Amino acid sequence: MALRALLVALVALALAGAALAAGSKSTLRITYWPHGRSQSATTWTLGCGPAAGTHPARIRTCAQLKAHPADLRPATRACTIMPTRTSPQAAIQGTWAGRPVNRSYRIGCPGWSDLRLVLTGRS
């Protein structure tokens, strides 16, 4: 009887762990406008755990985001740089560690330098 209770508890823990892992899935869509939003954009997908998608540096990008997950949180400082029509811009939408992400970035604004590899595909 005790063995059966232990087995039931282990199965319940395994199912809870699988549900938690599924809930923390990380899938992002990154759109990059190298010459401003008036020009054409490049869009990549990025999945982490394992690294997947079309992002050109997906393995390094996943490693960076796992090491610094706070980089995807909303900026704590406002951007004081006026955008120009041709300023590089980027946007990230999707889910990171089970939480929704919907952010926009402009060159020189909070978040851009920390996420350069993620946003532009280049370090």
Features from the language model and the residues they span:
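N- and C-terminal low-complexity/disordered segments
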Residues: A2-S123
